[in-house]
Structure formats: C-alpha cells, structure tokens
Design a protein with these regions (language model features):
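ATP-dependent adenylate-forming carboxylate-activation enzymes
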Residues: 3-7, 22-33, 110-130, 139-141
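Short Gly/Pro-enriched turn/cap motifs at secondary-structure boundaries
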Residues: 207-213
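Conserved coil-to-alpha-helix start sites within the AMP-binding
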Residues: 1-16, 90-108
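Conserved AMP-binding/adenylation subdomain of ANL enzymes
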Residues: 70-86, 94-134
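Gly/Ser/Thr-rich phosphate-binding loop
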Residues: 134, 148-206
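Flexible, low-complexity linker/hinge segments
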Residues: 21, 25-46, 70-72
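Conserved pre-ATP/AMP-binding loop-to-beta segment of ANL
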Residues: 4, 35-50, 80-87
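Conserved AMP-binding A3 loop
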Residues: 45-73
Length: 214
C-alpha cells in the first residue's frame, strides 16, 4: 500500500539532521537504479531528485537545503502566500512540485488541506469544509475540479498550476467556478525549482508563452 501524503511528509522530515539523504522518485519507481548513482553524495545534500524534461535517461541530482528553501520567501511573495493561507493540494509528494509547495507553506505556518483519492466531489467537499482560499493542482485536475463545482466559490483567491499547459479556454472554466481568483501558471524543474511564471491576464493559447523569470 502506498504511503499517504502525511506519511510521505513525515518520512521526508525524519531524515533531516541524520546521515541519510532521501531520493525523490516517481511513485511507480520502487528503487533508484544503481546506474544512476555515479558519484558520492555531496556534503550538505538534503535530498536527491531526478532531472526532469529530458528525453533520455534521467540523472540523479543532489540538492542542498539552501538551494531549495532559500527561494521560499520569493515564491511565497509572488504567489501571495501568507501565514493565513488555506491551500488545497492533491497528489503524491513524489512530485517535487507538491513537496516544494508543502514545505514553503509550512515554513510560514500556513495551512494545507489534501485528499488522497482522485475524486473531485471529495475535493469540493474538503475545500468547502475547511474554508480553502487557494488551490494548487496540475491543470488537468483543475479542469476536473472546476467541472464538478456545483456553484461559484468567491472564497478562492489564488490558483497555482504547473507542469502542464493552461490556455484561455481553461481560464474561462476556472473563472466561472472561482470568479474572484487570480491564477498563476509556472514552469519549473526538480533540479532548478521555479523558472518562469505568468498570471491569467497574460495567458494565451501560444505554447511558446511561458512568462517571465522568477
């Protein structure tokens, strides 16, 4: 049985301050192939990640805590995340985008609400029950959630999305469900964190439109 998001987070945090370094891999990868381990773990490494966006075999890349966490204040400011934020997020922490955002919110003392199953009716219930005001989902899940929303929700002020494209047609759907929201689409990589971002006012259907650098 796969570990819950809560269990994944506890396991990741449990390695902090120990000699062990966790390696973040896709949920369907049970172990790291020895062929990827080509060098010693560098001093100060807090985790290992697999390079993303490559057509070839991914490479194992180690990151220090500072290379990752030092960017939290910048991304939180751009996305409007504060200690009062109540964000809904769904998905495994094997996706480093989820892990990054979880820890950036926790660093502020913000609240994270999640649900394990891919069930938009459950998501809608949890969002309403916990007075969520921000969403973080990949675009395909955002579309699913917006279609299942039984009524518009003015409480949602921020929508974060990444890893997939999001066009103007998608924004019409999202704005109908969350009329007072501002949507941020970002592009990033496990080995680099966030790279570029744009808001819903800047989105179009041109796949080359990736926004401005962080």
């Amino acid at each position: 049985k796969a570990a819950s998001v809560h269990g994944q987070l506890v396991r990741f945090l449990a390695f902090s301050g120990t000699s062990r370094v966790p390696v973040i891999v896709p949920a369907d990868m049970k172990y790291v192939p020895e062929s990827l381990i080509t060098e010693e773990i560098p001093a100060g490494a807090c985790m290992g990640v697999l390079t993303s966006g490559s057509t070839g075999q991914p490479k194992l890349w180690f990151r220090t805590l500072d290379s990752w966490a030092s960017f939290f204040p910048i991304q939180n400011t751009i996305f409007g995340i504060t200690a009062e934020t109540r964000l809904f997020c769904q998905g495994s922490l094997a996706f480093t985008g989820n892990l990054n955002l979880y820890l950036s919110l926790l660093s502020l003392g913000a609240s994270i609400i999640t649900a394990s199953p891919v069930n938009p009716s459950v998501w809608c219930r949890e969002i309403e029950l916990h007075h969520v005001d921000a969403l973080y989902l990949i675009p395909s899940k955002l579309r699913l959630l917006a279609k299942y929303a039984s009524h518009s929700s003015p409480d949602i002020k921020t929508i974060l999305a990444g890893s997939q494209s999001l066009g103007r047609g998608d924004m019409v759907l999202l704005k109908a469900a969350y009329p007072d929201s501002c949507c941020f689409l970002y592009y990033g990589a496990s080995e680099l964190s966030y790279v570029t971002w744009l808001t819903d006012q800047e989105m179009n259907d041109n796949p080359a439109c990736i926004g401005k650098p962080f």
